[in-house]
Amino acid sequence: MNVTGIKTKKITVEDNDLLKILDEYVVEMREEEVLIITSKIVSICEGRVVPINSIEKAELVKQDADYYLMAPDNKYGLILTIKDGHLIPWSGIDESNGNGFFIRWPEDPYKTAFKIRDYLVERFGLKHVGVIITDSKLTPLRWGETGLAIAYTGFKPLRSYIGTTD
């Protein structure tokens, strides 16, 4: 499969139609291509935003996380969480480029990934199209962040090499 990244304008809380954004920026797709879209764009379009001045971030984290660890002596003020099976800080809640809003993860990222894929299949008349919804994550005891697929559809994400030559 080929992976295609597409640059868009800055998506803001005024943008609430994901399919309209796809219409504007995804002008063509071919068989076996994968569209990668950030969870931030999906979340904004789904209205998963909360004004920063309406709630403490820690309270929002508690609402969204499956599990959380709030260490009172944490010099970085970081809250580690497990959200949808992922170890991720702040339950995936982002405020960078949020223009005064906390941006939560999509409510059901797989449902949205399937919706996007169905739309692309119908729009372009294709059969084999993939969609990945991404975010970034931390790795404990490492600096930096790594890309993370929080949802995918349209392809097998892993290939088994058991029984093959190394």
Language-model-detected regions and their locations in the chain:
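N-terminal and secondary-structure boundary signal
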Residues: 1-166
